């Protein structure tokens, strides 16, 4: 998913440590492994960001954040709203639920793009 370019401070073709001495070559390998482990530690994503964002790839990924519309008096607690980065309360209704005027609003949401149109039903 991501491509990281790691700058190598030493030249691999001409090693800084002579190969003839065995002890120095093993220490050179140890320092190289230590550098790689440090880089891996820096590149690892913290657990908090992994859980909060949609990092897991779904079959049909949803773009945007899901939240329950608590501003509406007629809000159905089982419905959720697809917020597309707009102001709060202006997201798309993703389930059949009564809106603020008391009429039920249903939206057919395309979950690949996250776009839907509100259809007011009597």
Swiss-Prot record:
This protein's UniProt keywords: Mitochondrion
Subcellular location: Mitochondrion
Keyword Mitochondrion in record: yes
Superkingdom of the organism of origin: Eukaryota
CC annotations in GO: mitochondrion
Additional record remark: A stretch of 270 kb of the mitochondrial genome is duplicated within the centromere of chromosome 2 resulting in the duplication of the gene. The expression of this duplicated gene (At2g07713) is demonstrated.
Protein name in the entry: Uncharacterized mitochondrial protein AtMg00540
The organism of origin for this protein: Arabidopsis thaliana
């Amino acid at each position: 998913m991501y491509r990281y370019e790691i700058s190598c401070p030493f030249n691999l073709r001409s090693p800084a440590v002579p190969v003839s001495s065995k002890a120095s070559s093993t220490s050179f390998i140890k320092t190289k492994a230590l550098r790689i482990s440090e880089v891996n530690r820096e590149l690892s994503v913290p657990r908090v960001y992994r859980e909060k964002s949609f990092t897991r790839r779904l079959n049909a990924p949803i773009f945007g954040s899901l939240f329950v519309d608590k501003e509406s008096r007629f809000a159905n607690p089982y419905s959720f709203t697809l917020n597309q980065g707009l102001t709060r309360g202006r997201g798309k209704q993703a389930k059949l639920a009564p809106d603020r005027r008391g009429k039920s609003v249903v939206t057919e949401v395309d979950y690949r793009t996250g776009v839907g149109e509100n259809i007011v039903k009597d």
